[in-house]
Amino acid sequence: MNRILIVHTSWYEKHIAKMLDISVGILEKSYKCDKAKAPGAIELSALAKNKLEKNNYVGVLFLGIIIRGETSHYDLVSTETFRSIGTLADQHHNIALINNVICVENHPQLKERLVINTQNNTNALIQL
């Protein structure tokens, strides 16, 4: 059975657990899912790169949440996270990589987007 790597952050555990349940529920019908937890969003691509070098995966799904705070930290984290995942995708063009790191202004936006974004992005991974 082909393997999918799901790399997720350690922040917002309750929400990440829901994202994992949704993704695994969709993927496990056709794939074996391996999970790896990164300390934060910026570390997602480094962890995935390490796992890709040691294992044979047909796809990687990134799960994370970045919520704007009162400082510019949000801008730095979201920009660097998306840049590093994009760079990894360029380096591994033969593997399907989907970024489901959800960037929001607040918790109501997260609640509004979490389920549908996770479902859509997990299904997009299958289509690649």
Residue ranges and their predicted role:
Residues 108-115:
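Internal, active-site/partner-interface "lid" segment
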Residues 2-35:
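Glycine-rich phosphate/diphosphate-binding loop of Rossmann-like nucleotide-binding domains
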Residues 26-54:
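Active-site rim loops that border cofactor/substrate pockets in soluble metabolic enzymes
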